[in-house]
């Protein structure tokens, strides 16, 4: 449980996350906090470099929010972008153990080997700490309800019935056209009790529409609306450009005078 003078927030990680972070108990709270903030900052820099984004993307509001809150989000995204080979498989496995929704991009891009390893490590934590899982599953309903309350419904469409179905349809349509984009955008669009920093998952498939709208801190459905607009434009852009080019060609002086 985290407490500040203005609010109380409870730990919402799974037992897998708890087991993975257990070695942090070797450090004092201050030491681990400092180390984690440094790791998060290095992750933010790595993300920008690997995606070949301008350095000012470090000021992307969801990234800034993830940094000052010390959330594992940036570490998870960095691990998912770590690349191919054995190191990439290990990184993906750790990412999913830290945040279960990290499996969504792997599922969308059909990476069975990485999914199996990730699920294997998670299942191994059941053997290591079965009592944690028993307690977690027993209290899962209460934990989920508390998380919904403390996140004020989150930023995704999950708790907005009017937006949920059209957003899900948009992600499915996008998946048929671009699996990578659908996998990265599904989490900020649909994951329950999502936070502002979840929008950092859009960075690998960023567009101008997403860059502008996802920078705005708003919990009234802006994130799913932004993603639906982006999906619409991904489908409409080529036909619109083709039509505009045809109109421009028809209106050009050479065409008119021939």
Regions found by a protein language model. Give the residues of each.
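Primarily membrane-embedded glycan-assembly and transfer machineries that use lipid-linked glycans
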Residues: 1-89, 111-258
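Transmembrane-embedded, aromatic-rich helix segments that form part
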Residues: 92-95, 101-110
């Amino acid at each position: 449980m985290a407490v500040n003078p203005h609010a109380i927030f409870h730990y919402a990680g799974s037992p897998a996350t708890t087991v993975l972070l257990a070695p942090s108990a070797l450090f004092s709270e201050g030491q681990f906090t400092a180390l984690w903030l440094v790791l998060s900052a290095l992750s933010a820099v790595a993300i920008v470099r690997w995606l070949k984004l301008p350095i000012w993307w470090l000021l992307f509001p969801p990234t800034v929010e993830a940094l000052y809150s010390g959330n594992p989000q940036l570490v998870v995204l960095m691990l998912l972008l770590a690349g191919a080979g054995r190191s990439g498989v290990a990184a993906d496995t750790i990412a999913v153990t830290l945040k279960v929704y990290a499996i969504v991009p792997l599922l969308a891009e059909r990476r069975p080997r990485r999914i199996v390893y990730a699920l294997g490590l998670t299942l191994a934590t059941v053997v290591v700490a079965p009592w944690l899982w028993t307690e977690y599953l027993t209290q899962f309903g209460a934990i989920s309800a508390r998380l919904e309350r403390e996140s004020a419904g989150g930023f995704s469409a999950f708790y907005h019935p009017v937006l949920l179905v059209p957003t899900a349809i948009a992600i499915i349509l996008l998946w048929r056209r671009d699996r990578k984009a659908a996998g990265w955008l599904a989490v900020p669009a649909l994951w329950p009790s999502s936070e502002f920093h979840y929008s950092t998952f859009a960075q690998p498939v960023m567009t101008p529409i997403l860059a502008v709208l996802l920078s705005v801190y708003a919990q009234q459905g802006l994130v799913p609306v932004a993603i639906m607009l982006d999906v619409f434009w991904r489908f409409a852009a080529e036909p619109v450009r083709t039509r505009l080019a045809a109109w421009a060609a028809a209106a050009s002086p050479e065409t008119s005078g021939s």
